[in-house]
Amino acid sequence: MADDFSDLRQEYRHVALLEQEADANPVAQFKDWFGQAVDYGVPLPNAMALATATRDGKPNVRFVLLKDVSEQGFTFYTHSVSVKGREMAENPDVALVFYWTQMHRQVRVEGRAHLLSDEEADAYFNTRPHDSRLAVWVADQSVEIESREYLENRMAEIAEQYPGESVPRPATWTGYRVVPERIEFWQGRESRLHDRLLYTREEGGWNIVRLAP
């Protein structure tokens, strides 16, 4: 494989993103774009990069799956004792990025992560497939384990412990809602003259500005 990536280019030829056509509410605009991504056949359109940082500002990023979006924010689920869970506990300022490559679209979200209530976490947990509910009991996310065999043996033990459909939610497995302060929509355009609209939360609503590519 070549080490020089300078010639990896693609021309963007999708539709424009114009102020007069964009929704005044960024959540509504996101839902519109998300629905289009689903209809377009984008694989895993709810995959989003979640960036966190320690109290000292050391960054970390990984992909998680969006499970709900509303006026309250963007919701996902994970272990509170994972690296991201510990980082959000000490520094709740986070960022999200969605990239729908087939449509040449990106959405960036900046906000603060808030823990969901136990009732909300339970409600979602109980909708997960049985094996997925068992899997969260196998080990706390991000801890060191000795082998793949350990995981498989633990899964067998947990399955024996909870043979029926009723599987309790571990206290360390929970949900987070990112309450947005800024949301930017990026649409790739010809000649790299991309469209970028930035929504910033203000008292009583959202301010929209256009950014240079």
Model-predicted segments: where are they?
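Binding-site signature for planar aromatic cofactors or substrates
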Residues: M1-P213
